[in-house]
């Protein structure tokens, strides 16, 4: 095994794109490792990970073999009776073999097999030096990096995410003599652009992280992240509050700075009259600042900026941040005040002139459909139908507001504030906001009953209209976000415990559509309903997979196509518990066998069991056990207590096993055969009453 040395590769660049930086760093790291692995160069990775700042991408590996392992080869040649003539001299066959091997035939070795003795050429090829392989490995890694818009600079033909300024190629204490992207490798790196003067000469790769830290650069993104969180939290505590640190904002800031330093800032209290969501969005999305909240989660007039420098005059830095945020807040306040003058109800007048979809009419048409759906759904879940209709009629009005035009992410949120200002009941104003939940993957569903009703009605109309208008998603195309709407609808129903009949709701949604897209003879309601139901189930498959539910369990329930998604969920829970029972596998296999037997039957199977035709003790015992189980589980099925149903059915295993071991189902006597089929049908129907448990059979 060859010696291993630490390896450092650093590409020093101009400021790299913030959003692309993590992906570039990971791709560079992965590409270098893949290139070494492809060439058989051993690597001790340890806890190595991608290293990066806005001005550099680096790979630091604790151990890389100095050379490839030697390559041993063996090439079989001709047998002796072909290789040598009668005088023991080489024939043309042997001479050709030796020439191809590049050696004299006398240097060839011999080996034997079942056919006799033959010549063989064995060779040992030394491995290439890793230092010689690394330039090509780096070129491959750079070429494979996901750079959406490569740049060219100077007179070079090279292209990269940003112009490359320096290159560190250090293997052990030796510089690899190579040129990449127009820059020659060296041991010289650079510190912070403003807080460190001069170059930094690295004696060895192991000096890299500490040398940069001394030069005010945290090259490890995790270290920058931890420092930012620590400093932001400390600044917020100093202000008497707590910082709002969203993951997205934090990741952006981590990739904007090399040496983060928190700066506490403030703005005029008058701006707090604006919905805090608008102010927070301005701070986070536009300026990458961290808002400070009070103990009740309300926005305060203070915020925290992250400087890429430790300033001697922090107050001046704070003034700069405050100067940047003030005009944006002033605009938001102007939009809000103007919207309040107009009023939420008046905003709705413009919806009739906004096209929702060519076949589905205007946004006003959609509002009318959603209002009717909400009014129909509300009584089924204990919500007020009058309030449901009112909330739905107002829910889209804020789309015409100045605030939402400037901050599209505030749709619904702005409507809540405007409804509250207009004196609408709190239930209605909250529902206007919650109608959009869940807004993204992993978001919470609506919490209030009215919000849940609106969320369901809105998504139901979107889905029904989309499918009726032929807008079903294909591949990556889903312009109306029907997949997201389907999952949002399903989650809201299931997680709210609403026992709604989904096919009936789909029918109501289809019936309210414009005549141009209503189901017709060629594509009737039943077809559209079935397509949409299956589409929603397909979204549920991923939902349950994310929760750790086995695909076999999902398929077992999906085969029954329960009308209620909440009922679907209860069956999923029950089948998960049933699968842990010792009887589960045997009963699943038995039900699979029953299905296969019944599938081959021609003609009608009797509905009842004739006890006078039960001849074998095992079939008598099974018939008695099945009737008892049916009696015991009827009430539990009615109550949807599927766990109890399956637990009771599990007790049938001894009788089921005995039946299949000792009874011939396809008896010669047609009456006996029909009676046994009737028994199996009764058994199979009850075993499959909660889920098609045969899916559990391996």
From Swiss-Prot:
The primary site where this protein sits is cytoplasm
Residue pairs linked by disulfide bridges in the UniProt entry: none
Keywords (A to Z) from UniProt: Aminoacyl-tRNA synthetase, ATP-binding, Cytoplasm, Ligase, Nucleotide-binding, Protein biosynthesis
Task: Provide the E.C. number(s) assigned to this enzyme.
Answer: 6.1.1.14
Q: Which domain of life is it from?
A: Bacteria
For whether the record's keyword set contains Ligase, the answer is yes
Q: Could you tell me one molecular function GO term of this UniProt entry? A: glycine-tRNA ligase activity
Task: Tell me where in or outside the cell this protein is found.
Answer: Cytoplasm
Q: Name one GO biological process term.
A: arginyl-tRNA aminoacylation
Q: By its UniProt entry, which Pfam families does this protein fall under?
A: DALR_1, tRNA_synt_2f
* Catalysis performed (reactions): tRNA(Gly) + glycine + ATP = glycyl-tRNA(Gly) + AMP + diphosphate
InterPro entries from the xrefs? DALR_anticod-bd, Gly-tRNA-synth_bsu, Gly-tRNA-synth_heterodimer
GO cellular component term, pick one: cytosol
Record-stated family: Belongs to the class-II aminoacyl-tRNA synthetase family.
PANTHER family tied to this protein: GLYCINE--TRNA LIGASE, CHLOROPLASTIC_MITOCHONDRIAL 2, GLYCYL-TRNA SYNTHETASE
Instruction: Tell me the subunit arrangement.
Output: Tetramer of two alpha and two beta subunits.
What protein am I looking at? Glycine--tRNA ligase beta subunit
- The gene is glyS
């Amino acid at each position: 095994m060859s010696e291993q040395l630490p390896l450092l590769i650093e590409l020093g660049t101009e400021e790299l794109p913030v959003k692309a930086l993590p992906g570039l760093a990971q791709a560079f790291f992965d590409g270098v490792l893949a290139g070494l692995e492809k060439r058989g160069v051993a690597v001790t990775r340890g806890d190595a990970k991608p290293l990066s700042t806005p001005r550099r991408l680096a790979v630091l590996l604790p151990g890389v073999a100095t050379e490839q392992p030697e390559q041993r080869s063996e090439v079989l040649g001709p047998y002796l009776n072909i290789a040598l003539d009668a005088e023991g001299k080489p024939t043309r066959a042997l001479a050709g073999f030796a020439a191809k091997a590049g050696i004299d035939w006398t240097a060839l070795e011999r080996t034997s097999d079942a056919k006799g003795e033959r010549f063989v050429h064995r060779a040992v090829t030394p491995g290439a030096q890793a230092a010689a392989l690394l330039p090509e490995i780096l070129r491959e890694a750079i070429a494979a990096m996901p750079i959406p818009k490569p740049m060219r600079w100077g007179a070079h033909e090279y292209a990269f995410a940003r112009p490359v300024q320096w290159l560190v190629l250090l293997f052990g204490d030796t510089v690899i003599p190579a040129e990449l992207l127009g820059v020659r490798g060296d041991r010289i790196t650079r510190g912070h652009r403003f807080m460190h003067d001069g170059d930094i000469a690295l004696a060895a790769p192991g000096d890299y992280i500490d040398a940069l830290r001394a030069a005010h650069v945290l090259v490890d993104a995790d270290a920058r992240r931890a420092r930012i969180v620590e400093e932001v939290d400390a600044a917020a505590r100093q202000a008497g509050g707590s910082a709002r640190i969203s993951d997205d904002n934090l990741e952006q800031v981590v990739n904007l700075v090399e040496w983060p330093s928190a700066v506490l800032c403030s703005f005029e209290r008058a701006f707090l009259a604006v919905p805090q969501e608008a102010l927070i969005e301005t701070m986070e999305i536009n300026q990458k600042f961290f808002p400070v909240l009070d103990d009740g989660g309300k926005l305060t007039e203070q915020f925290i900026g992250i400087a890429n420098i430790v300033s001697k005059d922090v107050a001046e830095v704070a003034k700069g941040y405050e100067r940047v945020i003030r005009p944006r807040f002033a605009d938001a306040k102007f939009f809000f005040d103007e919207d309040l003058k107009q009023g939420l109800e008046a905003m709705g007048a413009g919806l009739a002139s906004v096209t929702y979809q060519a076949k589905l009419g205007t946004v006003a048409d959609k509002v009318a459909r959603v209002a009717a759906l909400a009014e129909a759904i509300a009584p089924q879940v204990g919500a007020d139908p009058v309030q449901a209709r009112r909330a739905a009629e107002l829910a889209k009005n804020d789309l015409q507001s100045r605030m939402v035009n400037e901050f599209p992410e505030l749709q619904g949120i702005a409507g809540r504030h405007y409804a509250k200002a207009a004196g609408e009941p709190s239930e209605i104003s909250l529902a206007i906001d919650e109608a959009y939940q869940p807004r993204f993957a992993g978001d919470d569903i609506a919490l209030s009953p009215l919000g849940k009703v609106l969320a369901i009605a809105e998504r139901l109309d979107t889905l029904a209209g989309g499918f009726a208008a032929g807008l079903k998603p294909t591949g990556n195309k889903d312009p109306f976000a029907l997949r997201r709407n389907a999952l949002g609808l399903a989650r809201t129903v299931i997680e709210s415990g609403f026992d709604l009949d989904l096919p009936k709701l789909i029918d109501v949604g289809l019936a309210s559509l414009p005549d141009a897209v209503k189901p017709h003879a060629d594509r009737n309601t039943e077809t559209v309903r079935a397509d949409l139901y299956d589409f929603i189930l397909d979204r549920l498959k991923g939902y349950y997979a994310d929760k750790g539910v086995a695909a076999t369990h999902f398929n077992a329930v999906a085969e029954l196509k329960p009308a209620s998604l909440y009922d679907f969920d209860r069956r999923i829970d029950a089948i998960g518990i049933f699968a842990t029972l010792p009887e589960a596998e045997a009963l699943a296999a038995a039900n699979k066998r029953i299905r296969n037997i019944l599938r081959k039957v021609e003609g009608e199977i009797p509905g009842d069991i004739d006890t006078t035709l039960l001849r074998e003790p095992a079939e008598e015992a099974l018939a008695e056990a099945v009737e008892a189980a049916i009696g015991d589980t009827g009430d539990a099925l009615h109550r949807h207590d599927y766990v109890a149903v399956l637990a009771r059915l599990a007790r049938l295993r001894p009788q089921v096993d005995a039946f299949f071991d000792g009874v011939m189902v396809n008896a010669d006597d047609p009456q006996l055969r029909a009676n046994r089929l009737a028994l199996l049908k009764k058994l199979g129907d009850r075993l499959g009453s909660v889920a098609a448990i045969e899916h559990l059979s391996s």
